[in-house]
Amino acid sequence: MSAEPSRNPRTPPVSAVDIDGAAKRIAPVVTPTPLQLSDRLSAITGAAVYLKREDLQTVRSYKLRGAYNLLVQLTDEEIAAGVVCSSAGNHAQGVAYACRSLGVHGRVYVPAKTPKQKWDRIRYHGGAFIELIVGRSTYDLAAAAAVDDIERTGATLVPPYDDVRVIAGQGTIAVELLEQLNTEPDLVVVPVGGGGCIAGMTTYLAERTANTAVLGVEPAGAAAMMAALAAGEPVTLDYVDQFVDGAAVNRVGTLPYAALTAAGDMVSITTVDEGAVCTAMLDLYQNEGIIAEPAGALSVAGLLETDIEPGSTVVCLISGGNNDVLRYGEVLERSLIHLGLKHYFLVDFPQKPGALRRFLDEVLGPNDDITLFEYVKRNNRETGEALVGIQLGSAVDLDVLLARMQGTEMHVETLQPGSPAYRYLLL
């Protein structure tokens, strides 16, 4: 699924000149990140595929670029009043690092459910210049507390994406990749959350290249930019899947939306499901040794679901690498489901000896494994329900497995990914 903005160009909120200026401002602090050719992705697509490694940025994401570009332009009065942001992730770390670098005091509001290791990283980057304020239960409440703060204290709010200084800062990634590539790419693939990064990069590429196209990639469960383009304005999503947390926003920024509509048909938006993102994460780790967070792997996941012109030059932005190692169990699970290797069933077992053994002998194939078995014995009933997870040796074995199940006396219900029962019992 993809969508394109209006083909009636408008004036973007920032310009290439603004972005060039931002590149000069942030140069003392921001690390130029590598642009690396991926032999694997090049072989798969038939194109020359490069990875722009913002996961190797100082705070392990591109967010420092926009935060620093905003803070470095504050007036003396604004510096004295300090800055405020609300974030549970990369934006907070970028703001914290920029505050310490410039000697600006800041307050970061984070939801109470934020993992402690993220608190620790924010404190590490900000040092004595950052006050971490924890307490509100959700991000929306933390954001509301930040707004209350600036109204009460006169501090400057540092938005994660809906600010021209932030957009210009994120756009410096495009400045860098053009210098490193030394030619015009045919396609640049960018993850999309609130839209600040794709807005800045698209604006710069629109002015500084002749024929470069931009593909924005959103998680299917948080497709806020696609919804905005379809509606003709930013809209608020009723539900957002939080798994790809770095891109899980319910409404894109007004300024990023304006930048994309101004770019016309050079930019398009596509979505990928969260399982494809997990598969891309694991492939990047196992093949390139890249530890990408879910949002950081969006571009590669989108690339692999897009028809690419053989012989073309493509750049994929790996936007961040702040991943929690404790999430890898869920990452692997979602990837196996996406690849058709993991399936779940509700099975009514006869409550008599040998029922499980018969299931193993009659239903399971030689390369299939039971990965989950939760059984509840019922008194005064002839059958008992079990939740059964099966991992196949190959995705093509599913039809054979289902046929064997139908040939038994047991009633079997396949749980479909995305259904309410599936989400309740499993993910």
Swiss-Prot record:
**Which UniProt keywords are listed?**
Amino-acid biosynthesis, Branched-chain amino acid biosynthesis, Isoleucine biosynthesis, Lyase, Pyridoxal phosphate
Catalytic activity, EC:
4.3.1.19
Q: Where is the ACT-like domain?
A: 343-417
Q: Where does pyridoxal 5'-phosphate bind?
A: 90, 193-197, 319
Catalysed reactions listed for this entry: L-threonine = 2-oxobutanoate + NH4(+)
Q: Name one GO molecular function term.
A: threonine deaminase activity
What pathway, per the record? Amino-acid biosynthesis; L-isoleucine biosynthesis; 2-oxobutanoate from L-threonine: step 1/1
The cofactors required by this protein are: pyridoxal 5'-phosphate
One GO BP on record is:
threonine catabolic process
Pfam families the record matches: PALP, Thr_dehydrat_C
Q: Which residues does this entry mark as bearing N6-(pyridoxal phosphate)lysine?
A: 63
Question: What does the record note on quaternary structure?
Answer: Homotetramer.
The family assignment reads: Belongs to the serine/threonine dehydratase family.
Summarize the protein's role: Catalyzes the anaerobic formation of alpha-ketobutyrate and ammonia from threonine in a two-step reaction. The first step involved a dehydration of threonine and a production of enamine intermediates (aminocrotonate), which tautomerizes to its imine form (iminobutyrate). Both intermediates are unstable and short-lived. The second step is the nonenzymatic hydrolysis of the enamine/imine intermediates to form 2-ketobutyrate and free ammonia. In the low water environment of the cell, the second step is accelerated by RidA.
Its protein name is L-threonine dehydratase biosynthetic IlvA
